[in-house]
Amino acid sequence: MIIEKKLDALGLTLFDVDRQYRANASGARFMSHLTVNNVLYLSGTTPVKDGAPHLTGVVGAELSIEQGYEAARYALLSSLAVVKYALGDLDRVQQAVQLIGFVNSAPGFAQQPRVINGATDLLVELYGDRGKPTRAAIGCQGLALNHSVEVVLTVLFSGDGVTPPLARDHYVK
């Protein structure tokens, strides 16, 4: 519960993963997470605040680098909500292994690493050296539902027991 106390101190709240997956505004079909041994692989997550998309738009046109940075923090917070759902306790994370960040970028925008620093910085704030992942920051022109940022997180965890993944296709009507 140490990590959750740090989140509280930062004024950050994890959302209800099951509720968010049932909403499935994008109609996407994928699993929330999968494990291989003690490695937890997450599907991409986007910025959510108060149950709604946060800071949507194109970075470098509609959004500033600073707004993109904040969006990346919230996208990582969405990842942490899935980690908590899967593992039951964020303290089970032993190492952030890899973070891949996609930035909905204006033509010619080349500051994706500065935007994705928002996600990396939050990992380090929470986990210290264990929060330093390998990383890629990729610019793209367009993300689902006009999200500004999407991150894909992989972590190494301790202990046994992982909640089965939520599958978005189960909720598509």
Located regions from the model:
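N-terminal presequence-like segments and the immediate start of the first folded domain
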Residues: 1-77, 81, 85-97, 105-173
